[in-house]
Amino acid sequence: MELVRIFKEHNVFGWISVGTAVLSLLLLNLAIISNVTFYSYQMLPFAMAAVPFGVVELFIKRGRTGPGLLGVILNLFVIICVYTIVSVDTNLQFGF
């Protein structure tokens, strides 16, 4: 029960989500600067896996947390950007 209290008080899941989003954004910048699609493919699983952490944080704190919401928004932004970059670079039609 102590671990649950620590996770709840310190927004652990929200900060994990935000940290993953920041790392994904840095990798996204690297992919754009170097013009290599491979980096985009590497970052996508991290951004997709971090979204549930932010959602869990929102449910734990009942929507009163900044890191959880920020993590969800940033990771969804990363996922949309990655799909756009990959679809443009590889001439795939993802609907963008």
Swiss-Prot record:
The gene is yhdK. Induction: Cotranscribed with sigma-M and yhdL. YhdK and YhdL negatively regulate sigma-M. Interacts specifically with YhdL, while the N-terminus of YhdL interacts with sigma-M. It is a multi-pass membrane protein. It comes from the Bacteria. The chain crosses the membrane at residues 12-34, 38-60, 67-86. Coiled coil: none annotated. Its main location: membrane. This is Probable anti-sigma-M factor YhdK. One of its GO terms (cellular component) is plasma membrane. Keywords: Cell membrane, Membrane, Repressor, Transcription, Transcription regulation, Transmembrane, Transmembrane helix. It is found in: Cell membrane. It comes from Bacillus subtilis (strain 168). The keyword DNA damage does not apply.
